[in-house]
Amino acid sequence: WIAVNDGHFYYQLDLRMSPVSHLLISWIVADKADITRRDRVLVTLAGVAPDIDGAGILAEILTEKTNAPLLWWSKYHHVLCHNIGFGLLLLITVVIFSLKKWRTALLALLVFHIHLFCDYIGSRGPEGYQWPIPYFFPFSDRWQLSWEGQWELNAWPNLLLTALMLAVTIYC
């Protein structure tokens, strides 16, 4: 996609993914590793787990017409689980439940960071809001990762990437 801004041309690649895309990429990483079936499930879930903080959208939709709407998605998505604190909790959980402890834990940490990276470069909403990633939360909120070149959530490369990941999952 090429955009013109102040007479300059910009080429942008969108890697923002839906939870389905995060799941597929995490599965591909886990499937290629020398780990047990159980550990593959843990790695795959670790790549999707950061989006747990997006579940607040259900409460927000159900209460939006009330006198006291719950703004759980607006306030907490990309905050509670898109940070190093959650990454460490995820790492400990994977070490506890995996059979090949450190190999599986490192793969889980890898897919967790792939998730964060992809959200970092492509989380812009249709209204132009760029979701920042509070990477050092809960230890510090001073460093918020965001990039002004983020693509919109519904951009065509997202669909293409998901289709490619689905093809790799099915055929490889």
What is each model feature region?
Residues W1-C172:
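N-terminal membrane-targeting hydrophobic helices
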